[in-house]
């Protein structure tokens, strides 16, 4: 099983995938986030954040107040399973997390916590 995925983000407020499947044989899983757009991170920054489906909106709402220096995520938020930093045009960041943090029957979402982006920039994470 390939225990990693590359996710591209754009100036059109989109990720190039809406669903990520993680093989349960993976001990860790890595997400490489790219930004193929032209706009800087203060204008069109993106990150990749993993939470349960139930926690997604509250985490994003709390994150807005945190500001860009904190990657639009509340510091020490235990609801966040994994996240990258906010990146802009031409930048990349990656995050590796422990697959044991996910339950087989759990509902998980990935999203961008940059203010206003969650409506367009989200998808499911499934343990298979």
Curated annotation (Swiss-Prot):
SUPFAM superfamilies: Cupredoxins. One of its GO terms (cellular component) is periplasmic space. The keyword Disulfide bond applies. Cu cation binds at residues 46, 112, 117, 121. Its main location: periplasm. Transfers electrons from cytochrome c551 to cytochrome oxidase. This is Azurin. The lineage of its organism: Bacteria, Pseudomonadati, Pseudomonadota, Gammaproteobacteria, Pseudomonadales.
């Amino acid at each position: 099983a390939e225990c990693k995925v590359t996710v591209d983000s754009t100036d059109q407020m989109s990720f190039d995938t809406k669903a990520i499947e993680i093989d349960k044989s993976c001990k860790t899983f890595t997400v490489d986030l790219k930004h193929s757009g032209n706009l800087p991170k203060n204008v069109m920054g993106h990150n990749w954040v993993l939470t349960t489906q139930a926690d997604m909106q509250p985490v994003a709402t709390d994150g807005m107040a945190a500001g860009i220096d904190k990657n639009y995520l509340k510091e020490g938020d235990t609801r966040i399973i994994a996240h990258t930093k906010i990146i802009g045009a031409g930048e990349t960041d990656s995050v590796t997390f422990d697959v044991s943090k996910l339950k087989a029957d759990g509902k998980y979402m990935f999203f961008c916590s940059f203010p206003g982006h969650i409506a367009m920039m989200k998808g499911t994470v499934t343990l298979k």
